[in-house]
Amino acid sequence: LIVYKKGKAEPKNKVMLDTHMDEVGFIITYITEDGYLKFTTVGGIDERVIFGRAVKVGKELIPGVIGGKAIHQTTSEERGKLPSVEDMYIDIGASSKKEALSHVSLGDAVYFDSCYREFGDGFIKAKAIDDRVGCEILLRLINSDLPYSATFCFSVQEEIGTRGAAAAAY
């Protein structure tokens, strides 16, 4: 989304302010015969925070949990390190591939299932908070009287290489 806002004067140089609206997540790549969902990351996700996280899957926002091999099935070497994304899966409670496919499809998006929280002395946390704050700032600027005209861009694909902002800059 690109918005041009006329200000009180035209600047010497064109100005564009950009914020991104996308967020990191996952995409379903495979469904096992037991109904577990294999996935890959979308965007720069710190793999150390994935295991055990609650997620929502697909258009129906099916609840799931990211897991892996049970602790009693791991070797002592495996217990000493974090499992790789390739060794993790999403459990949506399906007991078969057929049951899983009745709710989700290959290529479905997966999102972290977390909520806004206030903590400490005036701190907040939420998924994709940088995106949401950026959008709010641009919306407030658009709705204000500006000294100079400016272009505002609400872009996507920042999480996979700032592609949206790069295209909008032209």
Regions found by a protein language model. Name each.
Residues 1-170:
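N-terminal hydrophobic/helix-forming segments and targeting peptides
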